Amino acid sequence: IRGIDFLNYRSNATWDDNAAERTIQWVNEYKGIAALVWHWSVPSEEGSTDCNFYVESASANYTTFSISRALEEGTWENKVLMADIAEIAKQLKKLKDADVPVLWRPLHEAEGAWFWWGAEGPEPCKKLYRLLYDQLTNVYGLDNLIWVWNSYTYSTSPDWYPGDDVVDIVGYDKYNAVDGKPNLSSISSTFYSLVQSTDGQKMVAMAENDTIPSLENLLKDKASWLYFCPWYMNYLTSEQNNPAENLKEIYNSEYCITLDELPDLKKYPLDGSDADSDAVLAGDVNLDNAVNLADIILLQKYLLGEVTLTKEAYNCADVNTDEAVNGLDLSRLRQMSLENA
């Protein structure tokens, strides 16, 4: 998992940090999973290019942009909103065109109310989230987005949930290191509360965090977080957040799937079958879960043009995996049959 921020994308942006292109390059080169967040900056006044995402109580650099007014057609805020959605859709379409699926976590940490999209309560925030989902999915046709909703476990948190139909994964941002010391807790009570919040229908991830929980605590508490994604720089590389020994232990354990262990997700079967099943059944041309004389006869008939093969049978007939079915495969199949006799 690599986290990437699309914070420089908006309709009046003056600088492009090529986050979309960097996402495409990393996913295609390293075969990893990109987790995108969008610190959506907006102006306080019409026509202004001074844009921020924090509210006044959270930062000296803030915006007074109103989410409620932005949801009203005809306002200047609504024009900014829709133009920004069009811009982010353009960037996300680059990913779709490159066949790059991503974890997409917009309007994150809304309930904290330190960002403008959460400053006016749950109803306008949910309305904006659903508008964004409808625009990106139905208007712009982006089917490469796995939608992550950033939740909490407060008594008010259910009021903020936008709905099962627009959420794929429930995420939680964990920042609980105190006094310059890491907190290795699995926060299992939080995990199980989030699981229960959707009646177990959604996977739950640590979408953003400081300390990665220790392997011991994760196993002991059975807190099966889908993934974790430490924030950048010292959040990952300092002893006060993530001790080196803890990082080595979790990344080298069977519990954690690291980049080198991740299967090729573009080829991974969606039906839950083993991605390597074709290799295991190489030579099983008639698809009866055995390699024998019957497969040799069927392959001979195919090479003579007497029969055709289904795609699955063709893949099994490509014994030497050179993406072609010919006499070399027949020779290898005969050898395999003798070896199995």
What do these predicted ranges mean?
Residues 29-34, 97-103, 140-146, 165-168, ...:
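Loop/turn elements at helix/coil->beta-strand transitions in domains of secreted/extracellular proteins
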Residues 276-341:
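Cellulosome-associated attachment modules in secreted, modular CAZymes
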Residues 5-13, 68-82, 119-122, 171-182, ...:
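The substrate-binding groove and active-site-proximal loops of carbohydrate-active enzymes
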Residues 18-21, 87-91, 150-162, 185-194, ...:
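Alpha-helical scaffolding within the catalytic cores
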Residues 105-107, 111, 129-156, 201-212:
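Aromatic-lined carbohydrate-recognition surfaces of secreted/lumenal glycan-active proteins
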Residues 12-15, 19-131, 138, 142:
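Substrate-binding cleft of extracellular glycoside hydrolase catalytic domains
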Residues 2, 157-181, 230-231:
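Aromatic- and acid-rich polysaccharide-binding/catalytic face
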Residues 202-276:
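Substrate-binding cleft of secreted/luminal carbohydrate-active enzymes
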